Amino acid sequence: MNINATLFAQIIVFFGLVWFTMKFVWPPIAKALDERAAKVAEGLAAAERGKSDFEQAEKKVAELLAEGRNQVSEMVANAEKRAAKIVEEAKEQASSEAARIAAQAKADVEQELFRARESLREQVAVLAVKGAESILRSEVDASKHAKLLDTLKQEL
């Protein structure tokens, strides 16, 4: 055989192989490549959506944290105000209680002073009557004595 005939036969076999490959082998390979490219594109799109969803979730979490911090600081401020109010009320109650106790003590002292004065008046009246009786050495009438005591009490 001649080199031209062999070359021609190889060319025919080559083109036959190319035709067979293009007709029967290439379409399933191209279809598989297209499907894989679609899956990769879909995966990339899903990753992009996931990334944007993650960023949105981070923003929302940051907002919720800020809101939570604000609420906590507000609660702390309210608690501090309430504590200050309770302390102020306790001070006012203690002050009014102290004033009440002082007034009661003053009233008790005045009452004891009044009792002491009355007792002293009675003792002075008794002493005056005894002194007058011893000076006069006479018997005094009981009704006159009572009148004298009352008069003396009133004068003292």
Curated annotation (Swiss-Prot):
Cellular component per GO, a single term: plasma membrane
Subcellular locations according to the entry: Cell inner membrane
Membrane topology: Single-pass membrane protein
Superkingdom classification of source: Bacteria
UniProt keywords, alphabetically: ATP synthesis, Cell inner membrane, Cell membrane, CF(0), Hydrogen ion transport, Ion transport, Membrane, Transmembrane, Transmembrane helix, Transport
InterPro entries given in the database record: ATP_synth_B-like_membr_sf (IPR028987), ATP_synth_b/b'su_bac/chlpt (IPR002146), ATP_synth_F0_bsu_bac (IPR005864), ATP_synthase_B_chain (IPR050059)
One family name in Pfam for this protein: ATP-synt_B
Transmembrane segments: 7-27
Any GO MF annotation of the entry: proton-transporting ATPase activity, rotational mechanism
Principal cellular location given in the protein's record: membrane
Keyword Ion transport: yes
Quaternary context: F-type ATPases have 2 components, F(1) - the catalytic core - and F(0) - the membrane proton channel. F(1) has five subunits: alpha(3), beta(3), gamma(1), delta(1), epsilon(1). F(0) has three main subunits: a(1), b(2) and c(10-14). The alpha and beta chains form an alternating ring which encloses part of the gamma chain. F(1) is attached to F(0) by a central stalk formed by the gamma and epsilon chains, while a peripheral stalk is formed by the delta and b chains.
Functional description taken from the UniProt entry: F(1)F(0) ATP synthase produces ATP from ADP in the presence of a proton or sodium gradient. F-type ATPases consist of two structural domains, F(1) containing the extramembraneous catalytic core and F(0) containing the membrane proton channel, linked together by a central stalk and a peripheral stalk. During catalysis, ATP synthesis in the catalytic domain of F(1) is coupled via a rotary mechanism of the central stalk subunits to proton translocation. Component of the F(0) channel, it forms part of the peripheral stalk, linking F(1) to F(0).
Entries under NCBIfam families matching the protein: ATP_synt_b, PRK05759.1-2
Protein family: Belongs to the ATPase B chain family.
PANTHER family: ATP SYNTHASE SUBUNIT B, ATP SYNTHASE SUBUNIT B', CHLOROPLASTIC
Name the UniProt record assigns to this protein: ATP synthase subunit b
Organism expressing this protein natively: Neisseria meningitidis serogroup A / serotype 4A (strain DSM 15465 / Z2491)
